[in-house]
Amino acid sequence: AVETKNLSISWGEVNVLDQLNFELNEGEKLAIVGPSGSGKSTILKILAGLILPTEGELKIFGEKQNYLRLDQNNPPDVRLVFQNPALLGSLTIEENVGFLLKRNKNLSKKLIHEIVRDCLSEVGLFNVENKLPNELSGGMQKRVSFARALITDQTLSAKTKPLLLFD
């Protein structure tokens, strides 16, 4: 599902990743461990298409990834759950979780609400759909972030310290 060949990234003079090679097949799990500043989150950001490597090749499901995800017409479905839940403060919990579904014009508002409610219940959250993120604890916000990653059938899910501050 994921293959890297000589993947490198530099921030100015600093090499963050140097010639990273790995292959992750469908159904396999990979733990990326290392000290702070070793490039763990950078690897996940590259996989999610948020940044591009300086050198090397990344393939997801056999397709070479040359563009940032937002620049692609039909990008691979990669979900990223960050240490910080990255919720939009002006949106309700339902809007934060369901924004991916709103792109699908075939789904009714009622169905979107039901799907969001089901995903929230999967992570142990109930009756929070109309709340704003700042009305929830940090652990609850983390659960919302997980619910957002569950919202549709994702093909690849990457997590950076997802259980930190999880209640």
Where are the predicted features?
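Helix-to-loop junction immediately C-terminal to a conserved catalytic motif
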Residues: 48
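The feature captures the beta-strand-to-loop junction immediately N-terminal to the Walker
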Residues: 33-35
